[in-house]
């Protein structure tokens, strides 16, 4: 069983890390994308990614500094470098070393630049969302660039499993890089809804954090069966069987009265 997460825009390279990084799987492809990005001016980057002038300048500098060979001075394990809502829920900094080792074998972070990352893969600072329409030799966007690569990787990771399963905790933008026609695994989606205005609905901020919490739950509980995901109860969420299906698990939270 593999769990998929989206990356985060915010990055943390200030907090020290205690674990060694591993080499990303698709460094060559990432280096080729960096070369394309290096041809862009700050104005072009701002327009391409809808960024402020300051953020565009920061990322142009990041592209210039990026190196094909990551080391402890220019990189950090991905799961400890990403710093958004999902990663607040995951809270990888408080995971024990055995937990991080388990995550390395069961968690995959999708990335516009790196394609697919294991949690401890060395991440250099960058900004390149999967939905960016960055023209490249493979086509008009990053979905064309990555093609079957990510799907083939997920198949390879579970090639020895009789009943492979991918638990999708990523956003639609990122999961779109996984080609369902190529992927051999069963896909299970987890949906998180909160009670608001008299109805249950997906609230983006809460749902993102809940995806990270579910990843943490899977890691700490060593989840290997879809049925065991139903026990997720962090932050007040509970499995809602009446509105769930075999491949769509819904978790709901109602505020305390």
UniProtKB/Swiss-Prot annotation:
InterPro entries: YaaA. It holds the Pfam family H2O2_YaaD. GO terms for biological process: response to hydroperoxide. GO terms for cellular component: cytosol. It comes from the Bacteria. Transmembrane segments: none annotated. Belongs to the UPF0246 family. PANTHER family: PEROXIDE STRESS RESISTANCE PROTEIN YAAA, PEROXIDE STRESS RESPONSE PROTEIN YAAA. This is UPF0246 protein Lcho_2652. It comes from Leptothrix cholodnii (strain ATCC 51168 / LMG 8142 / SP-6) (Leptothrix discophora (strain SP-6)).
